[in-house]
Amino acid sequence: MILPVFAFGQPVLNKKADSITKEYPELHEIIENMWETMYEASGIGLAAPQIGKAIRLFIVDTKQMKDKKKEEKKEGIKKVFINPVILEEFGNLWSYEEGCLSIPDIRGEVERKSCVKISYLDENFEPREDIFDGMEARVIQHEYDHIEGRLFIEYLSPARKIILRGKLENIKKGKVSCDYKMRFAIK
């Protein structure tokens, strides 16, 4: 089932999410709904807070990225991350223009480390520890920020934040056009 994406201004997007257990109600259904929702919105990552669930869960699929950097000759990843913990961010800082399904029509340059070491549980609650680099690392860091209650716009320069203030207020009020269902803070 395709769910509405919670828009900027929804309190759940600014809350640090809670860890979950294997017994979390309807977890596999939530994960399936997240995949459907993300693909419908043409996203490459989606965190549970973006569908209104304050739980430590996100999904990433970089296999279907349209504009992968040519020098990255990787297949990409398609993974579920449950109760993830970033153990280390390392490598060079690199800037890239990010966007977010919760903040439609806004993009901004964000600097992030090029590599990330992360521990997590997969969809079968099997423990994993992996190192990712490049776009995979970036998307993971972006989605991880969501479960920590942070949005990419918090990394933008003060001047850019001022410029975006009006657009962000419009998003809160639902005065934005996008091709997927959204739930807004102010009706």
Stretches found by the model and what they are:
Residues 1-187:
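Positively charged
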